Amino acid sequence: MFIAYLTAGAPDLNTTKQALLNLANDGADVIEIGVPYSDPLADGMILQKASQQALKNRFRLEQLWHLLAEIELPVPVVILAYYNQIFHYGVEKWVTTLVNLKVKALIVPDLPYEEAAILRAACARHHLHMIWLISPTTPKVRAKQLALACDDWIYLVSRTGVTGVDAHFDNQIPNMIAELKQVTTTPIALGFGIHQKQQLQLVKSWGADGVIIGTACMQILLEKGVDQLTEWISAMKKSSYP
């Protein structure tokens, strides 16, 4: 399972549209779209820059909704947003909007499971899946709880800290994958810092079912453009997760 991440509206909406279409048809099994935010706590410098660029261009949520309504992607779409964005938009309205746009799942990186009762209930009512992040610092009991709460796939964070192209993986990751597979059959995708083919092969050897590539995608898109990103993603996927 190869999951590609894009920040909506960075560097502009037309580029986002073309990148979504290209990746969905030539590489990605799932596309995760990040909603630009002024204070993205989980994001490293590159994704922060992407958000800032989109916001500087006066990005509005309605533009993303219109884009998703306009194009039909042949792969599942996951939206990543911070809870403040959802709260101000309206929880029920947010969930129903995503469902009407055929979005498959939602990730809210700054919302603890225990504080998400209202959002979880709304998602359950409207059959919108939720994906939770598990990190190397997550206690084992809690990690199992979160794994069982994930509907589509489990987002396993490769290390503590923020996103970025740091190649370091926490040494607990192989054991965490093995332990999670003992309690659930939900696919496990590893994210944060993945940008090299040898990393994909290593992650696959640990038993992970997929990878999430975000920072590297946005770095290539911002610096080299859509065509280079498409070629790179296609080559990366073929190397380990064809």
From Swiss-Prot:
Tetramer of two alpha and two beta chains. The keyword Ribonucleoprotein does not apply. SUPFAM superfamilies: Ribulose-phoshate binding barrel. It is found in: Plastid, Chloroplast. This is Tryptophan synthase alpha chain. The active site is at 32 (proton acceptor), 43 (proton acceptor). Its EC number is 4.2.1.20. Belongs to the TrpA family. It catalyses: (1S,2R)-1-C-(indol-3-yl)glycerol 3-phosphate + L-serine = D-glyceraldehyde 3-phosphate + L-tryptophan + H2O. The alpha subunit is responsible for the aldol cleavage of indoleglycerol phosphate to indole and glyceraldehyde 3-phosphate. CDD domains: Tryptophan_synthase_alpha. One of its GO terms (molecular function) is tryptophan synthase activity. PANTHER family: TRYPTOPHAN SYNTHASE ALPHA CHAIN, CHLOROPLASTIC, TRYPTOPHAN SYNTHASE, ALPHA CHAIN. Keywords: Amino-acid biosynthesis, Aromatic amino acid biosynthesis, Chloroplast, Lyase, Plastid, Tryptophan biosynthesis. InterPro entries: Aldolase_TIM (IPR013785), RibuloseP-bd_barrel (IPR011060), Trp_synthase_alpha_AS (IPR018204), Trp_synthase_suA (IPR002028). Its main location: plastid. GO terms for cellular component: chloroplast; cytosol.
